[in-house]
């Protein structure tokens, strides 16, 4: 293991490690009042350095949001440290991802931010704590057996494309901020309906449920722990899996496979079923897209002939 320690840039603390052993990916978040975020940042940095944790942690006066990788035998030590050190995080949920065939992160970044989630809400009367009803994975699974609800996917369009629950409503968007702007208008005819929301780990649908409550919706619930918690619950109990395809993840793995269902098509030929996201080989472009094996042979991991030709001219 090689370690490049320690740099400090304004509101960031970060370092990088070259791992040779596999790690586990976990995420956790909580909306809560945090007063001394500078102190929190330093304490988190020291424990992460000690436990060789990589990933990203955002902290603000409204809470904490983390997505990290850690060696399996060190997870419990991290949990104990967080719950003992920060009394407002004693009940925080840790989501454990299942697929770590590829290392998710190359460095750790702990950053102070104005908000732990970029939602773009500027209404001063909005209360993020006034959320909809939290559903356990068991309750959520039971509700899916019924037909008296509207199921809303609170993830971006490119996430929905490769995996989602059957009959889930997609709010077409590239960002969560954009999605919130569309949400209320798209669901305005369902105010009397039971609305169930889900996302990857829970933070987006929790915030979205509060925004809906703020806008007069009364029957709003969300999946606590998100798809990650649901998938773990279903696998543990050997129940039929109702999430189809892959979970898009915001790290170097890009996705976790849940079922063998392929829900999308190659973005280039638009014919071949495919759900493998890659980034354009031209780093100046770096577009995220789905490319089948046939288009890969002709375009070689580029999103277009233009990027291919540009790359060749520079190399």
UniProtKB/Swiss-Prot annotation:
Signal peptide residues on this chain, from the entry's feature table: none
Catalysed transformations (reactions): uridine(34) in tRNA + AH2 + O2 = 5-hydroxyuridine(34) in tRNA + A + H2O
Pfam family, one: UPF0176_N
Gene3D superfamilies tied to this protein: 3.30.70.100, Rhodanese-like domain
GO molecular function, a single term: oxidoreductase activity, acting on paired donors, with incorporation or reduction of molecular oxygen
E.C. designation(s): 1.14.-.-
Similarity field: Belongs to the TrhO family.
Keyword line: Oxidoreductase, tRNA processing
Uppermost EC category: oxidoreductase
UniProt-recorded name of the protein: tRNA uridine(34) hydroxylase
KW tRNA processing (keyword) present: yes
A GO biological process held by the record: tRNA modification
Stated role: Catalyzes oxygen-dependent 5-hydroxyuridine (ho5U) modification at position 34 in tRNAs.
Residue ranges of coiled coil: none
Active site: 199
Gene name as annotated: trhO
InterPro entries xref list: Rhodanese-like_dom, Rhodanese-like_dom_sf, Rhodanese_C, TrhO, TRHO_N
Domain Rhodanese: 145-235
């Amino acid at each position: 293991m090689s370690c490049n320690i320690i740099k400090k840039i304004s509101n960031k603390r970060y370092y990088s490690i070259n791992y040779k052993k596999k790690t586990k990916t976990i995420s956790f978040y909580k909306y809560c009042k945090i007063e001394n975020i500078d102190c929190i940042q330093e304490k988190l940095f020291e424990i992460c350095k000690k436990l060789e944790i990589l990933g990203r942690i955002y902290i603000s006066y409204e809470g904490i949001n983390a997505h990290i990788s850690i060696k399996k035998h060190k997870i419990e030590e991290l949990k104990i440290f967080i719950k003992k050190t920060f009394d407002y995080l004693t009940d925080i949920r840790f989501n454990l991802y299942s697929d770590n065939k590829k290392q998710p992160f190359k460095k750790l970044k702990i950053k102070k931010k104005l908000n732990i989630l970029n939602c773009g809400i500027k209404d001063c009367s909005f209360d993020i704590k006034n959320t909809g009803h939290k559903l356990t994975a068991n309750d959520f699974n039971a509700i899916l057996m019924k037909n008296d609800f509207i199921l809303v996917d609170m993830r971006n369009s490119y996430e929905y494309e490769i995996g989602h629950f059957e009959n889930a409503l997609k709010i077409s968007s590239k960002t969560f901020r954009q999605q919130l702007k569309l949400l209320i208008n798209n669901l305005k005819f369902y105010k009397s309906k039971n609305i169930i929301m889900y996302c990857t780990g829970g933070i987006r649908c929790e915030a979205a449920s509060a925004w809906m409550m703020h806008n007069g919706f009364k029957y709003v619930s969300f999946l606590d722990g998100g798809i990650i918690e649901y998938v773990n619950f279903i696998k543990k109990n050997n129940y039929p899996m109702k999430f189809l395809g892959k979970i898009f993840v915001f790290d170097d793995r890009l996705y976790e496979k849940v079922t063998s269902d392929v829900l999308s098509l190659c973005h280039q030929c638009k014919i071949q079923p495919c759900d493998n996201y890659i980034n354009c080989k031209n780093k100046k472009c770096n577009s995220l897209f789905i490319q089948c094996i046939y288009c890969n042979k002709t375009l070689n991991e580029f999103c277009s002939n233009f990027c291919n030709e540009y790359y060749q001219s520079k190399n």
